[in-house]
Curated annotation (Swiss-Prot):
It comes from Staphylococcus aureus (strain NCTC 8325 / PS 47). GO terms for biological process: 2,4,6-trinitrotoluene catabolic process. Pfam families: Nitroreductase (PF00881). PANTHER family: NADPH NITROREDUCTASE (PTHR23026), OXYGEN-INSENSITIVE NAD(P)H NITROREDUCTASE (PTHR23026:SF125). Its cofactor is FMN. Belongs to the nitroreductase family. The keyword Flavoprotein applies. One of its GO terms (molecular function) is oxidoreductase activity. Coiled coil: none annotated. It comes from the Bacteria. It is an enzyme of class 1 (oxidoreductase). This is Putative NAD(P)H nitroreductase SAOUHSC_02829.
């Protein structure tokens, strides 16, 4: 195994869902910016980046969220950095956001945009993304998990611990964030939380995973 391959495998064996961080140890600004950039630079379906990353460092807000986040209580107390990942709503071909992405970010020529919109609509129909608002939002939310995974892997490569979390009251937390002007519920929904820092102690047991042959199947020669 090459040095790079070993480095990657070591990072995946190092990573675990850290329940309690050492509150005295903080992730450096440089390292955390690298983690955020790995999220921002992540791939997404059609390259539309339907996400927003909100870093919650205000302890009073963390305490308020903790009361309604049973799966994140210890992390909210102890994590060096705590991130909420929002998923964008209404990502359709003619929505203002998609038009902004096509015209201002991707710089499509105006005459090519109708053809792009047509292909976009066909894709969403074929994949049942445009069936209803929930399907459309779920598609956006799926993209946030790509960024989430990349952020946690980047952290592990830097020797930083992390924990992804869905253990919260979605409606209540959404209301808190909306009332504080942090979450525009017309544009976004809260997809997932993730905490970063340094473990308070080693995991109580070794990482467990199913065997390679139970989850991986080759069709054709294994090369």
């Amino acid at each position: 195994m090459s040095n790079m391959n070993q480095t990657i495998m070591d990072a995946f064996h190092f990573r675990h869902a850290t329940k309690q961080f050492d509150p005295q140890k903080k992730v450096s600004k440089e390292d955390f910016e690298t983690i955020l950039e790995s999220g921002r630079l992540s791939p997404s379906s059609l390259g539309l980046e339907p996400w927003k990353f909100v870093v919650i460092q205000d302890q009073a807000l963390r305490d308020e969220l903790k009361a309604h986040s049973w799966g994140a209580a210890k992390q909210l107390d102890t994590a060096s950095h705590f991130v909420l990942i929002f998923a964008r709503k209404n990502v359709t071909s003619r929505s203002p956001y998609v038009q902004h992405m096509l015209r201002d970010i991707k710089k499509y020529e105006a005459q090519t945009i109708p053809a792009v919109e047509q292909k976009f609509d066909a894709f969403q129909a074929d994949f049942h993304i445009s069936d209803n608002d929930q399907a459309l939002y779920d598609w956006s939310s799926k993209q946030t998990y790509i960024a989430l995974g990349n952020m946690m892997t980047t952290a592990a490569l830097l020797g930083i611990d992390s924990c992804p979390m869905e253990g919260f009251s979605l409606d209540t937390v959404t209301d808190i964030l909306a009332n504080k002007g942090i979450l525009d519920t017309e544009q976004f929904g809260l997809s997932v939380m993730v905490a970063f820092g340094y473990r308070q102690q080693e995991p109580p047991k070794n990482k467990t995973r199913q065997a390679y042959e139970d989850v991986i199947e080759w069709v054709g020669p294994k090369e």
